[in-house]
Amino acid sequence: MVTAEFNPLGPDALSNPYPGYKILREHRPVHWNELFEAWIFARYDDVDAVLMHPRFSADRAKARTRFSEMVRQQQEQFGPFSQAPTMLTSDPPEHTRLRRLVSKAFTPRAVENLRPRIREIINGLLDGVAGRDTFDLVDEIAYPLPVIVIAELLGVPPEDRADFKRWSNDVVATLGGPFTSPDVIERARASLQEMVTYMSGAIAERRANPREDLISGLIAAEDDGQVLSEMEIFSTTILLLIAGNETTTNLIGNAVSSLLKHPDQLELLRSDLSLMPSAVEELLRFNGPVQATGRVAKEDIEVGGVTVKEGQVAFVLLGSANHDPAKFPDPERLDLRRRPTDHLAFGDGIHFCLGAPLARAEAQITLQALIELYPRIEMAGEPTWGGTFIIRGARKLPLRV
């Protein structure tokens, strides 16, 4: 009898979770997990049903579990600003208002206008490794690129960017919830406090002297007479900083790693760069940066043959859903011609990732720059994987060019 169960602390949770997902889909696609005190969903249809259902909440405070109580206690250590409403953790109508006010900065047209600047940044980073036979993609490209992009959007000067990346990394490291070690929590608490001090000053300065940047835009944003409160501006700015850094770094690292492990697909893309948009979608499906997320039932809800009771958590495995053969034939094969437009790497429903157009653009432009510059590119060693069971990615990816 197979006793497969989702184990976020297992040895393969970071290096390669996909074989474990396959076992779950085949033997225990829906099950109650005592460690999480949550229902685990591994199949595409069930995962999407949870994400799309209006009676599932993104607000973890609605959960009634020991796990959630531990998360709340952890948040309390970070102060009230960590519990302020954000698009990520709120429901309509609050979520609708926040998203409508913030979304103006991330429209496809706004991102399209950023493409030339993104290419300039990447070219500058590649100039920094010119003449070298080997370099680490994460250290030299994937790590600095998104922090430069989001810092420029927010109007953060170059000398402060290293602090922004450090703050972001420290906070993201706590996404393991109660599985996070006390020293990681303390480091995140200190970084969040530094971020609070910095952003409070930046917001006050923009109120006095508005600029052409995102912080000023959030202050000025108005919809039907509604504006963002001070706490909402602050929490939204921090959310954009964190979401715009770690996930994009992992997207780029995971994508390059996948291509180098499938040289036939790399050569296919090299021979036809018009495939780039669909290629990035397939790379997101195949090995996306966000592996899981959770929702809380507002009332008893039937999903996947079980009843998720009010206050219980539904933990959905996005990475598993994207490898479900019932949705994607031959899912373990990387196929850049697949065009998997309905993958769940960015989620689905009202909480679909607002920054998806920007993340796609950064990945597309980075891959094209690497292909155009280097006629030959290969791994100079195995990737080192890191992150959490929620957000995972290459921490080191040595390349030989």
Over which residues does each language-model region extend?
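Cytochrome P450
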Residues: 1-401
